[in-house]
Amino acid sequence: MNGEGNLNLHVRRGVVLTAVQQRGISSPTLLLFAAIVFMVRAVMLMLGPLLVALANDFGTSIAVSGQLAAATFVTLGITAPLVGPISDTYGRRPVLLIGVLLMALGVLGSGAAWSYGSLMATRLITGVGLAMLPPTIMAALADNLPPEKLGKAVGFIHSASWVGVALGVPAIALLGYIGGWRLPFYVTGGLSLALWVMLYLSLPSGQRRLGQSIDLINRFKVIGRQSASWYVLIANATQAAALVGLMTYFAAYMIESYGWDEARTAPGLAMLGIGAVIGSFVGGFIAGRARRLEWMAAISLTSGGVTGLFFVLDAHAWIVVAVAFAASVLVSVSVPVLTTLNMSLAGQSRGTAGGMFATSNQFGGVVGASAGGLMLSLGGYTAVGLLCLVAAVLSASVVGLVMRRAPEFRQGSSLDK
């Protein structure tokens, strides 16, 4: 992956769009996929800047409101591993259409929620829709692009998802400030419905392969037999817990500790999203290095310390935001590296491996949001910082002490050059 920088340069110049169009995926379709993953990321993390308003409206604590974010990750994690085999059997188009529709209906239903319980139910529905989209989009790209061109398109889509954090989540914070917590749900749900219409009109129908069965058990056995795959999943889940903990409780921490309102958190949330974009780029570079595991272990360990520092540092508000920005850069580096390792271990079962990887992401999200809320109720934001620190240290330990010594990763070192 020594050409990582060139790939990103080509994406910015639009070459990848032309290449995709020549292989049967038009530029509008690729941009539509990018808009969908942008919306997925924004919807996934949209509760962060709304936690205080939700707690006030439903008469609960911020810690209890944080469980609404965890609910999304629960159904997302359960659904994610099923998506790959199902889309392989029934086609990408129906899975994408159902996923976008469920996302839209879940978000609109959240805006109309009349109680904490009803909002919990609609967030569960939203999670099912979210789980169906990114893995299926990646599979659709792989169906139509050769390996040498697939990476460019995947890089473009992955970047778009983090723009959902840099721009989408701050926009949600501003909408919440302007019109209350329901307005962001209505706007986001309406945009999701518009995406569904465009997807329905533009995405060509596929054909199901007759006689092909889903065969979930055997597909999972292929991955489950490899201990190395479990190391990757554990490292990813623990690092994801630190990332989601930071993203979920950043706005609430700044509102409660520094007297900010939702509008003032928007620039800070944008900085966290930009930090994640930078971290992902750095991770893509490290993924192709011979000593990627050593680098990742050191960066993961540092990310835990910086994230923990954010929740305890007593300094000027924008100094604290700068620390959060640094934390978002560091905590995001591992995702491209672990994704690369996961795919290299999967052989011919990459769809199933991708679903399991997505599940590990969501499991980490549940820990970051739900356990973060529990820690908040027990020990305040200092305890949330401690949770993020412990999660990152666990991830670094798995990478540095276990994965570095595993023969499967040493055997793959030739791919790093």
Segments (PLM) and residue ranges:
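Helix-breaking motifs and short loop linkers at transmembrane-helix boundaries and internal kinks
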Residues: 59, 91, 112-118, 259, ...
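Helix-to-loop junctions at the C-terminal end of transmembrane segments
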Residues: 80-91, 279-291, 376
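Cytoplasmic helix-loop-helix junction between adjacent transmembrane helices
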Residues: 122-163
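Cytoplasmic membrane-interface "Motif A"-like loop-to-helix N-cap segments
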Residues: 89-98, 288-300
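C-terminal transmembrane helical hairpin of 12-TM major facilitator-type secondary transporters
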Residues: 293-338
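Juxtamembrane intracellular "pre-TM" segments in multi-pass secondary transporters
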Residues: 14-23, 203-233
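Helix-loop-helix hairpin linking two adjacent transmembrane segments in secondary transporters
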Residues: 147, 155-203, 249
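Conserved MFS/SLC helix-loop-helix module at the cytosolic interface between two early adjacent transmembrane helices
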Residues: 78-114
